[in-house]
Amino acid sequence: MEEQKIELKIINMADIQSQEIEWLWYPFIPYGKLTIIQGDQGDGKTTLVLNLAAKLSKGIGLDEDMQVSEPMNIIYQTAEDGLADTVKPRLEVADADCEKIMVIDESEKSLSMIDERLEQAIVQTNARLLILDPIQAYLGGGMDMNRANETRDMTKKLGLLAEKYKCAIILIGHMNKAAGNKAAYRGMGSIDFFAVARSVLLVGRIEGQKNTRAVVQIKNNLSAFGHSKAFELTEEGFHWLGDYEITADELLGGITPKANKKERAKQLIYELAETNSVVKSEDIVNLAEEKGISKRTLENAKKELGIKGKRIGESWYWKLDEIVKP
């Protein structure tokens, strides 16, 4: 069969208008790009994404780094859970505005990543976020996700759709069983899924903490890597913890992470409070850095403890006299 000839078209970079990357959640989820959230089955990927969607449906950020100005429309496609008995109850528990969360009806025909209904739905609903859960359910009949050429074409088309409408697209993927391999190669199927995504997040259980899950960025082509995050899953439900000290190697290898630096920062503050009612901000920051605690982690500990700043002369101080040590 003769290969179809394509007319040559040249793009001059002088004709391209420069644009800045827009972020749904900096530096984890960009608008107009593909993001993969992957992890082992049962480790909380879907729970994380449903709670993210619930917050966004009300114009609220899940994390303090998430700048959300208004409620947004979201398309959530799942091939693993029932809408009535699983998805809707979980959204209600997460206090979602279900008017803002929509699903493409697949009762007559299953959806695929290149289905024209995806574009139609984004246009019709003005969705800013599209979620496909899981990746392998939306390949289409006869498609082999382990064949690089097939997955590359499919994900490229999906990426162009995200770019065209400035819509963030999240693909949820299960990890394979290749323990010890790099996270990129443990993702289900072809490495091309990983290659096309601009950001990849790994969700997993933290060794020694049965209720805590970590979120670690293992790929970012658009900015510096983000700080690892964590959340808890208990009988009371989902609880976002924010910054957490753990690496991808620790998470994948089942290694107990070093003591949480935020807890170490709190302990440092408690110790200072025993002998000081106020301490110069600069002195606390320097002392923390000597102990391997970043300024950001220290500020998070300060916020959680409700510590207020006080200006004395030309310098800022932390008021430690009202801290109640647990």
Task: Describe each region flagged by the PLM.
Residues 31-35, 72:
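Pre-Walker A (Motif I) flank of P-loop NTPase domains
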Residues 2-4, 19-20, 24-26, 41-43, ...:
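Conserved inter-motif catalytic segment of the P-loop NTP-binding fold
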Residues 100-102, 199, 308:
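Conserved beta-strand segments of alpha/beta enzyme cores
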Residues 36-37, 42, 47, 69, ...:
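Phosphate-binding/switch region of NTP-binding enzymes
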Residues 57:
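Gly/Ala-rich phosphate-binding loop of Rossmann-like dinucleotide-binding domains
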Residues 48, 52:
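Hydrophobic positions on the alpha1 helix immediately C-terminal to the Walker A/P-loop
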Residues 1-10, 123-126, 164-165, 207-326:
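C-terminal regions of RecA-like/P-loop NTPase motor modules
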